[in-house]
Amino acid sequence: MEEKRVKCKKKLTSTIGTWKYIQACIFFAIILISNFYGLKSFTDGFLLRRAVLNQTSLCENPPADVREWKNSSGCWAPKIFERAVIVIIDALRYDFLIPYNDSNYYHNAFTTPYETSVLHPENSYLTQFIADAPTTTSQRLKGLTTGSLPTFIDLGSNFAGTNIDEDNLLLQWKSLDKQIVLLGDDTWDVLFHDYLNETLSQPAFSFNVPDLHGVDNKVNQYVFDYIKDANFDVLIAHYLGVDHVGHRLGPDHPTMRDKLNQMDRCVKEMMDLLDDSTLLIVMGDHGMDNKGNHGGDSFDEINSVLWMYSKKPTFGYLKQPGKVLSANQVDLVPTLSLLLGNPIPYGNLGTLIPEPFYYYGDEYLSKAQKINIGQLNRFFSEYDLDASDFLSSSVHKNNNSYLDQYFLDFDYARDAFSYFKAIWAEFSLFPMIIGFLLLIIGGFNLALLMQDKSVIFRMSANMAPSVMKCLPVCLILILANNELHSPFPAEFYVLLPSFYILLNSFNQKLMEYFKGFVKLDYFSIFITFLHVCSFGSNSFTVWEDRLCHFLIITIGLVMFCKCFSEMSPLFACSTYSALAFILLQVISSYVTNCREEQGAFCVSTYISTPDNSLRTLIVLALMALSSIILPLILQLHLRRVLGLSLKLYHLSILYFFELISSIFWIAHHVFANDALLEKQYHHVLYSLANTYVICILGVLIWQFFLLSRSKFAKINVIERSYFVFALLYSFLSFLQRPLGHLSLFSCFLQILLLIQLKQWQPSVGHNFFSVTLGLLGLSHFFTTGNQAAISSLDWNFAFIHSKSAENQAISAIFMFLHTVGAPILTCISIPLFSFEPLSKKNRFLINLFRFSFSFILYNLLISTSTVFFAGFFRRHLMVWKVFAPRFMLSGILLVTHQLFVLIQCFGSSVVKFPEDAE
């Protein structure tokens, strides 16, 4: 009976203890949620969407009075063509069509447009076609049909497009009962489904990057018969093969030449089938860089091409002194509108491409431009009522010749375009300031808690009062805010609980607070200060990969010197670990994927396209070797540091997953260099990938279940934690290319070395190691082929599990894990730093919370710095190329780290430690 009562008492004590830990986790979550709202508030003010006007241009309401054209065949101007065939070749760069004396595969393969323009200039017009970032397909189609400028934040809708709700070309054609037929890229169907002829249209899934020919073959199956039958008014044929070859293999690959040759043959056949009343337009929606990407960072990524062809003479070339033959993509909208006889969409910002109108004389061109200017002025007046001074600059003088007046109107239209690009970069300062303050307060809260040795007791004690006092007040204020239509955003009210927590935590004297620091903690503060300040310089931000390597090597040297100051029995082991840490970082620093701004000062060594070079084969061999030695190294680490060892079946499971990973990437290399093998056996890769993912997720779920439900001895908890960490590393490394796999393996080894140094140098505080860990994750973010630039994303990992990415959620998860694999790896290693020999659960959780606070604080300071400088330099020339992408990366990493840290804290609170198992 007595024994039963003791067991019940222990069980009750354990339950109360677990609830106390969960309360501490909830309190921690409140702080992290306030950080999230800080990022959200700043983002809402910084990345604004432009206002969309609902007005629509009407046929009976022309913007300018051109009396001679009142009874013409078109709405506002005479119709020149009855039908149009619009051929979009995705990612078709301008120089792909221009002859070059070199051996690049993408040159001299698509020659028909250039040759026709040279031989028959009155029938053919070829020009550069300049896109505006963002250069995702969805945003480019919006620009090509509305004549407007999608904003930076609209980039994300490329993967979840919605119907366009502003005036556009397809709406205008539909209002005139024109039959619009789509073949190819289904992005058109997502954006303009209501306007398309459902019977004739044949949309094709667009995100299947590994499929180089499927969409193009489907287009060719119908397009030639449709042109021959002429049962359409507007035929849109959107080819994707060039874009997919660029993404998968890069532009300078034999497959690109084959694809461009195919496009050349298609265009020739279309030309033969045209009649005199049909206009053929061939264009790209954007270009690509030398790796096949098109984020919009470089000129090659926005430098597309436009070619127009007609069997009847149509084009007259206007001599403009000092003007290069080029057009903005928005210029197609008014040009195509007047050529086909429909109104120009209301929100258009483009100006006429002069050549199709100048063929009919300078008077005709001037009158057409007058309509364009009238449309621009009408939109201008509606959108910005304070623009009267600017509107008066469009002056029509009676003594001007038609051509002189055209040039005046052309310059005016270009100025209007530039003006709107400027005003759509306006920012809302109030939510930006609120967001910045929330991040600052969150930083103070974490800084105060990380030095508190009774942190779990304090957090669990403060959780209930914080919620009870702040929640009702916040709810009342938010409801009042909605009723009174207050300008304050909801994030403003998150300041209240954050500020309350700060005041409640600020109960230590300042000197007592700093007494908790050790010497190397001050050095880590100095390193953090340097990193935080570096974001004030666009050069340091661009070269952040080198800066991170420098800071980590500096930290390694300090650890090496620290070993000499404490001549302990483990002196030799500590020095060897510090030297190995430095050596691994030096080797990793040679793996880099350059960004455009680094120019000729950087040479990319990251292998993104597999080939049969000796370097690639060596990397594959080293990757296989790392898979073999990984379990052995983990076993050696456990024995040396904690006197433990992995069970045989744990080692066998690790070997199994590492073997599958190596086989997958070796097979991937073989198939990538043999098109015939890939065609026959590509399904083998997808089977391997899916087998790997399903099995490793099953093992991970099994291990988490055991840790939360079973009663283990202390050594089993630690051993299983290391096993789970190794499994997660294996999963993340599987989602890397071979060289990225080696970089992540280096990161894994460096984490183990840091754990050794922490155990063997107990006088070094946890703040030092948490800052080192944060820097290490960021450093290997760069060595795994990434940069703080959209163009560095490797989209192939969205298709690692399947030839089709119709399940976009799974594809997005794989892309995310590939991109931020290294920062995630360092984050999930935090519990391993919290274990101490013979420590109990309470001690482990205190270590875990304090280490987590310090780790999140470092990342929060980085995010706060990028937030501040992105806001401070919001008018800087490089804001959208340097400061904004870095702020977005910091925000993503901070949210990711907070999520994983919370999961770890909640999970650790329910792990069965030995004192629970008695």
From Swiss-Prot:
| Major location (coarse) | endoplasmic reticulum
Bilayer disposition of the protein? Multi-pass membrane protein
GO biological process, any = GPI anchor biosynthetic process
GO cellular component terms?
A: endoplasmic reticulum; endoplasmic reticulum membrane
Q: Which InterPro entries match?
A: Alkaline_phosphatase_core_sf, Phosphodiest/P_Trfase, PIG-O_N, PIGO/GPI13
Which subcellular locations apply to this protein? Endoplasmic reticulum membrane
SUPFAM superfamilies membership = Alkaline phosphatase-like
What EC number(s) does this enzyme carry? 2.-.-.-
What this chain does, per the record? Involved in glycosylphosphatidylinositol-anchor biosynthesis. Transfers ethanolamine phosphate to the GPI third mannose which links the GPI-anchor to the C-terminus of the proteins by an amide bond. Involved in cell wall biosynthesis.
**Name under which the protein is recorded:** GPI ethanolamine phosphate transferase 3
